[in-house]
């Protein structure tokens, strides 16, 4: 490969990379993850320690889908999206 071709690919990468990063950052969270399947979780022992935040309609962020589902057993909350809740 010639050095001109390598320079072209490098510059093209620098130009296009911010576009793809911005696209993924503004994608709606609902399109990235589905509503948690709460039938899988019945007790805290079912929950992993993996941080995958879930935002509920009460504006509370839950550690992951399992903790969201356990709270849903005792409170009338609904899933909003995967991620940390933000002020609206």
From Swiss-Prot:
Stretch forming the signal peptide: 1-24
Domain of life: Eukaryota
KW Ion transport (keyword) present: no
Residue positions with a glycan: 37
Keyword entries, A-Z: Disulfide bond, Glycoprotein, Protease inhibitor, Secreted, Serine protease inhibitor, Signal
Pfam families from the UniProt entry: Kazal_1
CC terms in the record's Gene Ontology section: extracellular region
Annotated compartments: Secreted
Marked site positions, Reactive bond: 49-50
Single Gene Ontology MF annotation: serine-type endopeptidase inhibitor activity
Disulfide bonds: 38-69, 47-66, 55-85
CDD domains per the UniProt record, alphabetical: KAZAL_FS (cd00104)
Domain Kazal-like: 32-87
InterPro entries: Kazal_dom, Kazal_dom_sf
Tissues expressed in: Expressed in epydiymis, in the caput. Also expressed in seminal vesicles.
Keyword hit for Ion transport: no
Cited function: Probable serine protease inhibitor.
Name of this protein: Serine protease inhibitor Kazal-type 11
Source organism: Mus musculus
Gene name linked to the record: Spink11
């Amino acid at each position: 490969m010639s050095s001109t071709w390598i320079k072209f690919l490098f510059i093209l990468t620098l130009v296009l990379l911010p576009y793809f990063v911005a696209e993924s950052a503004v994608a709606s969270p609902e399109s990235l993850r589905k509503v948690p399947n709460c039938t899988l979780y019945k007790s805290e022992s079912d929950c992993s320690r993996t941080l995958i935040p879930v935002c509920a309609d009460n504006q509370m962020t839950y550690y992951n889908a399992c903790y969201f589902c356990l709270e849903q057993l005792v409170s009338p909350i609904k899933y909003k999206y995967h991620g940390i809740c933000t002020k609206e």
